[in-house]
């Protein structure tokens, strides 16, 4: 009996240690979630009031697109074309930009008439997942399970960019995946492991090609920094990075190619870069916007939102 009690004690201690190791990651998910819920309560967002989180394009565009999407999924209609857009239009381009996120398929669980509420929940979920993935990156990158990773995960999830753009629900998947992609490229270079990099980058490209373009630009710059740190195997690292980046892009091509063809036939085909370089804003004033306690810019001069 004494032996059994000792074994049980060891098992309980092991479980306790495993639970403690998970606490920072769990906190990185739950703290942004709790703060988001408190904000909803304070602003009387349903079910705590009669308001909703939908604003601007989220209300006038994204919600109708989501409604069309769930109707197609439940009725078995084709995702290639829609008869509810004007006199009829392709649905592929809308799906590729607005609806391709894997999380959006959970809308099948949403009762009819609650699409707005589903989108609000999805927004909060993505904010919370940002905290989790960034904390996970810090844990693996610095080989630590310090509680501080939950703090920095929360800071990432509730950053100024998320505060300003969380309502653009089709963008935030890439923000969730970005820390995992960065961890993946580190593993690709340092450990010759490609699975995480390929899967996360391909998923990001499929989810939203617009933000993925910015992620890819960052990846090239970050890869060059990692390459400088490598003392050997640089050629192999370059080959792996190029190959798996192209492979991820090729995976995303199932949506990128139709999207490019459709955009080429739309009014966007005549758009080109300016022939001359010109400053449209004060650079010092723009840099000043990065400081704390400055007045939030709400004008319509279309200054670049740099974070």
Regions inferred by a protein language model and the residue ranges of each:
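Short intrinsically disordered, low-complexity coil segments enriched in acidic
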Residues: 1-5, 208, 288
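Start-transfer (signal-anchor) and selected internal transmembrane alpha helices
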Residues: 1-45, 240
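Alpha-helical transmembrane segments and their immediate interhelical/interface regions
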Residues: 17-29, 46-53, 206-242, 289-306
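Membrane-embedded helix bundles of polyisoprenyl
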Residues: 32, 36, 123-141, 147-228, ...
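Active-site lumenal/periplasmic loops and adjacent helix-entry segments of GT-C-fold
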Residues: 42-142, 147-179, 203, 207, ...
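Transmembrane helix-loop junctions in multipass membrane proteins, especially transporters and channels
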Residues: 44-49, 112, 191, 227-234, ...
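Periplasmic/ER-lumenal interhelical loops and adjacent helix-loop junctions
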Residues: 56, 60-71, 96, 102, ...
């Amino acid at each position: 009996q004494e032996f059994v009690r000792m074994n049980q004690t060891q098992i309980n201690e092991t479980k306790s240690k495993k639970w403690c190791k998970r606490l920072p990651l769990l906190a990185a998910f739950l703290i942004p979630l709790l703060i988001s819920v408190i904000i909803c309560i304070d602003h009387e967002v349903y079910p705590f009031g009669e308001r909703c989180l939908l604003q601007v394009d989220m209300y006038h565009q994204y919600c109708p697109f989501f409604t069309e999407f769930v109707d197609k999924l439940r009725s078995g209609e084709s995702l290639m074309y829609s008869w509810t857009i004007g006199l009829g239009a392709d649905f592929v381009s809308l799906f590729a930009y607005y609806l391709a996120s894997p999380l959006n398929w959970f809308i099948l669980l949403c009762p009819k008439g609650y699409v707005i509420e589903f989108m609000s929940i999805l927004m909060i979920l993505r904010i919370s997942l940002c905290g989790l993935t960034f904390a996970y990156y810090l844990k693996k990158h610095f080989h630590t399970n310090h509680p501080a990773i939950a703090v920095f995960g929360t800071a990432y999830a509730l950053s100024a960019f998320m505060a300003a753009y969380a309502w653009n629900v089709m963008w935030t998947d890439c923000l969730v995946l970005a820390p995992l992609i960065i961890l993946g490229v580190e593993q690709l270079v340092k450990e010759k492991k490609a699975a995480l990099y390929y899967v996360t980058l391909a998923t990001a490209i499929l989810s939203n090609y617009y933000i993925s373009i910015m992620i890819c630009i960052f990846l090239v710059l970050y890869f060059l920094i990692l390459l400088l740190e490598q003392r050997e195997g640089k050629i192999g690292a370059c080959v792996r990075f190029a190959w798996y980046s192209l492979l991820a892009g090729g995976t995303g091509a199932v949506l990128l190619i139709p999207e490019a063809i459709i955009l080429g036939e739309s009014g966007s085909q005549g758009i080109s870069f300016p022939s001359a370089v010109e400053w449209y804003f004060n650079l010092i004033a723009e840099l000043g916007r990065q400081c704390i306690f400055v007045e939030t810019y709400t004008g319509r001069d279309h200054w670049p939102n740099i974070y």
